[in-house]
Amino acid sequence: MEDRADHRQKLGRRGEDLACSYLEGMGHVILERNWRCRHLEIDIISMDPDGIHFVEVKARQKNVQAPPQENVNKAKQKRITSAALSYLNSSPLHRNMECFFDVAAITFEGEQACVEWIPQAFIPMYI
């Protein structure tokens, strides 16, 4: 029997797969998935003609009351921003590009999924 942690991990992976497909359909090139630096992580880093996108993916089952994007609170935004700065410092090629902080909120109902794309979900104070 699958435990809760395994279920959440599989749901998250499915959500990230859908988000990548969605982004590629919009013309993005996926640069990184689950990029890590120390204790920080960015779910997806993609690029389009406008710039570089740091994407937080939130996936939930339909029966959960709050929408997935509500989990991207100020503390989470700060961690994503710190991770983005680390990425930009380690990637001189992307350092001078316009940066966007987006959220892919994915709601699953059985095998069906609804992707809500939230471009520029937040604007950090320092980037």
Language model regions located:
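Hydrophobic residues on conserved beta-strands that form the core of alpha/beta folds
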Residues: 30-32, 54, 101
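Anionic group-transfer/hydrolysis microenvironments
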Residues: 34, 43-45, 58-60, 104-107, ...
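Domain-level recognition of nuclease-like catalytic cores that cleave nucleotide substrates
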Residues: 90-127
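Structural motif
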Residues: 39, 52-54, 98, 115
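Conserved catalytic cores of phosphodiester-cleaving nucleases, focusing on short active-site segments
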Residues: 23, 42-65, 80
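Acidic-basic catalytic patches of nuclease active cores, encompassing PD-(D/E)XK
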Residues: 1-33
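Short acidic/glycine-enriched loop/turn segments that link adjacent beta-strands
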Residues: 37-40, 111
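Mg2+/Mn2+-dependent nuclease catalytic core
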Residues: 61-84, 90
